[in-house]
Design a protein with these regions (language model features):
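Beta-strand-enriched, solvent-exposed domains that form extended recognition/catalytic surfaces
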Residues: 1-102
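Juxtacatalytic substrate-recognition/specificity segment
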Residues: 105-205
Length: 205
């Protein structure tokens, strides 16, 4: 079975366990972040029983500092194993949304934009999102964009939450009580403070 644990905002632990008649010598975690070309692999710690053949593998992916990964991205992963004879084994692929597990997240779809949020009224989020998306469509038309690619918005409620979710470069702004937003084009996601239409429009364009 495959499992993951989010230790937000520092790291994600990926776990695989099961039974194999093969004598596994190597386990590797392979992952992809969002629809981007950002992929990677991590060699896993592996334990296997000699008799029962139960095995356990664990990998940790850093998500902060120089390895910062923004909230809201979808992460796909699977494990590859090799036995003592060099035979290769591949697990199923699993995917999940990388969000702070301390909150009960909901999502709202507006056109090509998926909004992740918590602590607000759904109607307020939907209204703000719809107004912002109209402005985003107008900006796209001016830029002669034929189609708006799917993207994601993560609503950050307050400076305390922003301190964990935003990249460390924003610490100075947070100390001043400011928290605006950050867009991550490569990941197709942006983080924004509050559900104001102007903020959603600015980061969305």
């Amino acid at each position: 079975s495959l499992n993951h644990e989010i230790n937000f905002p520092n790291e994600i632990t990926f776990i695989i366990n099961g039974y194999s008649q093969a004598d596994l010598r190597q386990l590797t975690l392979n992952y992809q972040i969002g629809e981007s070309k950002v992929t990677g692999y991590i060699h896993s710690e592996i334990e296997q029983e000699i008799v029962g053949k139960a095995f356990f593998g664990l990998s940790k992916l850093s998500t902060s500092g120089n390895s910062y990964i923004p909230s809201g991205v979808r992460i796909k992963y699977y494990f590859e194993g090799r036995d003592m004879n060099g035979n290769q084994y591949v697990s199923l692929t699993k995917e999940f949304d990388y969000l702070n597990p301390d909150y009960q997240w909901r999502d709202t779809q507006v056109g090509a934009m998926t909004i992740f949020w918590h602590g607000f009224q759904h109607l307020d989020v939907a209204k703000s999102g719809e107004k912002a998306y109209v402005a985003i469509q107008e900006a796209a038309a001016i830029s002669n964009l034929q189609e708006i690619e799917p993207f994601r918005a993560v609503i950050i409620n307050n400076p305390r939450e922003a301190a964990e979710a935003f990249p460390t470069v924003s610490n100075a702004s947070l100390k001043d009580g400011l928290y605006g937003g950050f867009a991550f084009k490569d990941y197709g996601v942006f983080l924004i403070g509050g559900i104001g239409t102007d903020g959603l429009t600015h980061e969305g364009t």
